[in-house]
């Protein structure tokens, strides 16, 4: 995070610098299947309503590190009591583990500032990614905030244990789409990008209907024959730390149009408002959309909820679309 400050050392504005091999704005590609060895490119997705959206190849700020596996092993340790000579042998067992291949920042609804990513440790638990700062370490706050105060404190996650990070009774419906004045609606209305949208130049938050092509009828579904994926079991989702979804909409339950290839959504986890801690890394890839408090749940083993709504204080991923 790079910030400009005034004479009193107060942050006036800040920017998130994403250092990656991903190049935004290149022509979209059609890939039959996801290959983690390739840099992801934008993909053209058709939703249930027949509207096309060009999704970024991965969520904002995603850093891929490759998959590291640790096999199960055991080590015997012998202890000898110096005075009596008694010997005790114990066996230390290391269970197999997979270290998270990547991570991405989370965003509270309507904020431009990234919240600290989560990642899996060697035991498989979701933990905070290491953070290096000079006086601005990431922290959690039980307080609510105004828009202005949140800009001055981009390192603070507001609204822990509170369903809204906005102070008072205010609801800012248009933070991520300037013309939107609605809540919990799903449509293909044009998104008017705002200064609070964290997306790179040329991209913005998706319209609230953008994900409906990922189930056979555009609604919340579970089961591999009901969601638009080549996966038939949990194996690939576990290995890839994410889910592939077909870009062309389904032709019916269990019927797929594979001609458009797949688009990948990372399971980088989330920060729900209840505790503000990262959770479900390697399991969940919930993404925000532009309409107030709307998101799409993409979760292992086989859940896609294109028309979901949740607390604005929770922090989820952002996988934007082309303007």
How would you describe each model-predicted region?
Residues 146-323:
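C-terminal, surface-exposed recognition/capping segments
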Residues 3-193, 291, 295-296, 308-314, ...:
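Short, compositionally biased
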């Amino acid at each position: 995070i790079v910030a400009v400050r005034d004479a009193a050392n107060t942050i006036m504005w800040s920017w998130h610098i994403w250092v990656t091999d991903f190049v935004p704005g290149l022509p979209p590609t059609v890939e039959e299947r996801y290959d983690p060895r390739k840099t992801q490119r934008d993909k053209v997705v058709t939703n249930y309503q027949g509207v096309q959206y060009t999704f970024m190849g991965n969520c904002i700020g995603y850093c891929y590190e490759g998959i590291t596996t640790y096999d199960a092993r055991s080590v015997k340790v012998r202890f000898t009591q110096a005075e009596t000579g008694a010997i005790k042998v114990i066996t230390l067992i290391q269970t197999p583990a997979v270290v998270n291949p990547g991570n991405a920042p989370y965003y509270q609804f309507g904020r431009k500032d990234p919240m600290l990513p989560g990642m899996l440790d060697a035991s498989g638990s979701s933990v905070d990614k290491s953070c290096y700062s000079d006086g601005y370490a990431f922290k959690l706050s039980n307080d609510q905030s105004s828009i202005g105060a949140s800009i001055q404190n981009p390192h603070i996650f507001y609204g822990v244990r509170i369903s809204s990070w906005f102070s008072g009774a205010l609801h800012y419906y248009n933070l991520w789409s300037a013309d939107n004045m609605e809540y919990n609606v799903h449509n293909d209305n044009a998104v008017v990008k705002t200064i609070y949208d964290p997306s790179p130049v040329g991209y913005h938050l998706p319209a609230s209907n953008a994900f409906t092509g990922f189930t056979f009828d555009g609604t919340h579904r579970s089961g591999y024959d009901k969601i638009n994926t080549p996966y038939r079991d949990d194996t690939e989702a576990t290995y890839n730390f994410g889910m592939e979804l077909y870009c062309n909409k389904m032709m019916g339950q269990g019927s797929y149009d594979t001609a458009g290839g797949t688009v990948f959504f990372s399971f980088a986890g989330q920060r729900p408002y209840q505790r503000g801690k990262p959770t479900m890394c390697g399991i969940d890839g919930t993404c925000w959309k532009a309409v107030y408090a709307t998101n799409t749940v993409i979760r292992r083993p086989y859940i896609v909820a294109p028309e979901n709504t949740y607390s604005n204080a929770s922090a989820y991923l952002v996988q934007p679309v082309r303007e």
